[in-house]
Amino acid sequence: MFDEKNKFTDASFENCDLKNPADRDTLKQAADELLKMHRGKEEVCADVEEEKNESTDLLATLQDENKELKDQFLRLAADMENLRRRTIRDVADAKIYSIANFARDMLSVSDNLNRALEAIPADARESDTNLKMLAEGVEMTERAMMAALEHHGVKKICPEGQKFDPNFHQAMFEISNSDVPDNTVQQVVQAGYIIGERVLRPAMVGVAKGGPKENSTEADSA
């Protein structure tokens, strides 16, 4: 059945006579028109299919680009998070360790104050009131200095009786002692200090030798 816009309708063929040349021409024109319409529909279908394929390809391309952008975003976010953590750590380290050199110098001053106090004979200190007051003033100054350093994160290392640790201790000499395990700190010659997790100055110590080895001590206790 023909479309209403087609000039060839059912009524056009009601009285057609195939023997009549004019009617045959009419039928031929109708057939040509139908063929043209059919070919037009095929072309439209082909165009639609092509557009569909192009849309599918475009969608796949967009999906790939979206995935790539997502990966880039995730990598950037991870880099930013690492930078944030590193910045926080650097700021914290700067806050803790910014006074390290100053603290190390103040420890030398503290050592000198202690040496000055040790140089005062005990009897002279007791018999001379002025000397006694001077010594007490020096002691107060030294304590206040160490309290200030401790307030800023400086801690004293007191390793006597502990296992020798080269990261925190400096062995100055050995002490023969068979009663304690080897490498036990027996004497502290000069106190050590740390700030945060860093060593400002290792403790200078004497280390026991000649006692039971650490492994044998652990085996005996087991």
Swiss-Prot record:
Subunit description: Homodimer.
Matching Gene3D superfamilies: 3.90.20.20, Head domain of nucleotide exchange factor GrpE
Cited function: Participates actively in the response to hyperosmotic and heat shock by preventing the aggregation of stress-denatured proteins, in association with DnaK and GrpE. It is the nucleotide exchange factor for DnaK and may function as a thermosensor. Unfolded proteins bind initially to DnaJ; upon interaction with the DnaJ-bound protein, DnaK hydrolyzes its bound ATP, resulting in the formation of a stable complex. GrpE releases ADP from DnaK; ATP binding to DnaK triggers the release of the substrate protein, thus completing the reaction cycle.
Pfam families (UniProt xref): GrpE
GO molecular function: adenyl-nucleotide exchange factor activity; protein homodimerization activity; protein-folding chaperone binding; unfolded protein binding
Keywords of the record: Chaperone, Cytoplasm, Stress response
Compartments, record wording: Cytoplasm
CDD domains: GrpE
Family: Belongs to the GrpE family.
Name this protein carries in UniProt: Protein GrpE
Broad class of the protein's primary localization: cytoplasm
Biological process according to GO: protein folding
Keyword Ion transport: no
GO CC aspect terms: cytoplasm
Origin species: Bartonella bacilliformis (strain ATCC 35685 / KC583 / Herrer 020/F12,63)
